[in-house]
Amino acid sequence: MNTASFQLTDKITLGDGHEIDPGVILGYLTGRDIADVALSIGSGARIRSGTVIYAGSTIGLGLETGHNVVIREENTIGDHFNIWNNSTIDYGCTIGDNVKVHCNVYIAQFTTLEDDVFIAPGVMIVNDPHPICGFCMRGPTIKRGARIGVNVTLMSHITIGEGALIGAGSVVTHDIHPHSVAYGNPARPVKYVDELLCPFDLVDRPYVDGLDVKARQAGIRRRL
């Protein structure tokens, strides 16, 4: 028997072809006063046990979650969004199409992830330069196709440029130019992604050849 919990049933819209595990909560009511408590999830969703999706968000086609995922209210999320185990999207975020958020990630309020962004495990995204103050909260903007490595911390009010790559363990405190490779604490750009070579000789330049393949696959998914 499916023991998923649907709160505010009349305000939840689920597209066709969804698969929802027992132990999922949809339409969880926030304690905040929000304008619209409707929850809309597009067709083809795969929502695994332990996931909690709050009332008041819009999510596109092909959502897939791992276990123990939290997606809070007032989020606008595009098609084919993947988010894996123990990750949290706080409220007020904007997320594009074909975005992947890996395990144990925290994405703070008012963060923007554009299309085709990849967030590796353990990434922490923050939004407040003056903790507890609350007057100037704004998360980073991560531009289309940028990739954030394992255990990176992204500070508030910054922009990660289109196609940029942030190395594992970095702390990013300022804007990163498009297509740059940056790492360190604080992270600094060291080269461009099209200069990187594949150490295994699988492709010549992984962030040129490899991304071309990925883009074609994403285009096929959109047409389907």
List the predicted regions and their residue ranges.
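Left-handed beta-helix
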Residues: 4, 10, 16, 21-22, ...
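ABC ATPase nucleotide-binding domains
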Residues: 204-224
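Intrinsic-disorder/low-complexity loop/linker signature
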Residues: 17, 195-197, 210
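N-terminal glycine-rich cofactor-binding segment
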Residues: 32-34
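Membrane-proximal basic amphipathic "stem/tether" segments
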Residues: 1-3, 209
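Short, low-complexity, polar/charged sequence segments that are solvent-exposed and flexible
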Residues: 43-45, 144-146, 200-203, 209-211
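Context-gated lysine
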Residues: 11, 100, 143, 191, ...
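Conserved beta-strand-loop-alpha-helix hinge in the C-terminal portion
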Residues: 178-203
